[in-house]
Design a protein with these regions (language model features):
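N-terminus-centered regions that define maturation/targeting leaders and the start
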Residues: 22-196
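Intrinsically disordered, low-complexity segments enriched in polar/charged small residues
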Residues: 9-10, 103
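Bacterial N-terminal signal peptides that target proteins for export
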Residues: 2-9
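C-terminal motif of bacterial Sec signal peptides marking the signal peptidase cleavage site
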Residues: 17-20
Length: 196
């Protein structure tokens, strides 16, 4: 009987230590920073406000959607943005792209309305490949159209990308370049445009 107590005592201590370690681990998880998030004052209740649709072109350039984000991961070396839309939701092989940005410093926390082409970063082609610009949603077909903006937290700016804005960088070029570096996290914002 005495021997059994000696054996059980160390075992009970080990169990208590394991439970204590588990508690510490769980507490550490709950203290992690909030999620990496992307938002826009141009979006309300999941829909793009009318004021930000069908922007007027001036020299083939349109005012860009305002964006803001928070909780960029600490290890981020560079940010990139892609805004896109599938004309046919059932066919993701065909995509229209509305905003392409790369080389954004991780200290940046947003882009003001109309300022996407005027920051310390680089911009790719518009939807039609005719200019370095943002393209605003302006569908002429009736129905609901969904758009998505992905904000990439990257380990570094993809070295294959040019260090200047150019129409040579389209959706495919930027997506493929992003795949060559570590993607730390992605913050996404999706919204709809309803046309009659």
């Amino acid at each position: 009987m005495y021997t059994k107590r000696i054996v059980l005592f160390p075992i009970s201590i080990i169990v208590m230590l394991l439970l204590a370690c588990q508690s510490v681990t769980n507490n550490n998880k709950s203290e992690e920073t909030d999620d990496f998030t992307l938002s826009s004052i141009a979006v309300s209740n999941g829909e793009l406000l009318d004021a930000y649709m069908c922007e007027t072109k001036v020299n083939d350039v349109e005012n860009s959607i305002p964006l803001s984000w928070s909780n960029v991961p600490d290890s981020t070396g560079s940010l990139a943005i892609i805004m896109y839309h599938y004309p046919n939701p059932n066919d993701t092989s065909s995509v229209n792209c509305y905003l392409l940005l790369w080389g954004i410093d991780p200290s940046v926390t947003g882009i003001a309305y109309g300022e996407a082409d005027d920051g310390d970063w680089f911009m790719g082609s518009n939807k039609d490949g005719t200019a370095v610009s943002y393209t605003s949603p302006c569908s002429h077909s009736a129905g609901m159209h969904e758009y998505t903006i992905d904000l990439y937290a990257l380990s570094e700016t993809p070295p294959s990308l040019p260090t200047q804005s150019t129409i040579e960088v389209d959706y495919t070029v930027l997506k493929n370049a992003i795949k060559t570096v570590k993607i730390i996290d992605i913050a996404s914002l999706s919204f709809s445009v309803v046309t009659e």
